[in-house]
Swiss-Prot record:
GO terms for biological process: DNA replication. It comes from the Bacteria. Coiled coil: none annotated. The keyword Membrane applies. Keywords: DNA-binding, Membrane, Thylakoid. Residues 99-129 are annotated as: Disordered. GO terms for cellular component: nucleoid; plasma membrane-derived thylakoid membrane. The keyword Signal does not apply. This is Thylakoid-associated single-stranded DNA-binding protein slr1034.
Length: 129
């Protein structure tokens, strides 16, 4: 089973396009994440979403947003202009969750549950157990 979960930051605005045959939406964007060690450079990865998720990606996520992305990791062979082939990793997303927004708004700040009402526990002698 190929299952991949990654926390990363969007570094390029998502680009929406449609397939030629049946006009299925496809959205691609680039994310960045820290290397394995503190002194390692940051790594980048192309993320692809299909169908309804593609539309959601385009409408919702922007550079600077930190996301948790779940999906499948694949390798693509790319023909370079220099005349050689290069393998590149690509994450096909199945689910995306916003960790925090690049505009400074945390998802928890957008809508928070109501505060619970205070309960008076000063007279606990009347409790039957």
């Amino acid at each position: 089973m190929n299952s991949f979960v990654l926390m990363a930051t969007v570094i390029r605005e998502p680009e929406l396009r449609f397939t030629k045959e049946n006009q299925t939406p496809v959205c691609e964007f680039l994310v960045e994440f820290p290397g394995m060690r503190d002194d390692s450079p940051k790594e980048s990865l192309k993320v692809v979403g299909w169908g309804n998720l593609a539309n959601t990606i385009k409408e919702t996520y922007h550079p600077g947003d930190r996301l948790i992305i779940e999906g499948r990791l694949g390798m693509n062979m790319i023909e370079r202009q220099e005349g050689f082939k290069e393998k590149r990793a690509e994450l096909t997303a199945s689910r995306i969750s916003l960790v925090d927004s690049g505009n400074g708004i945390n998802p928890g700040e957008l809508s928070s549950p109501p505060e619970p009402e205070a309960v008076d526990l000063s007279n606990t002698d009347d409790i039957p157990f």
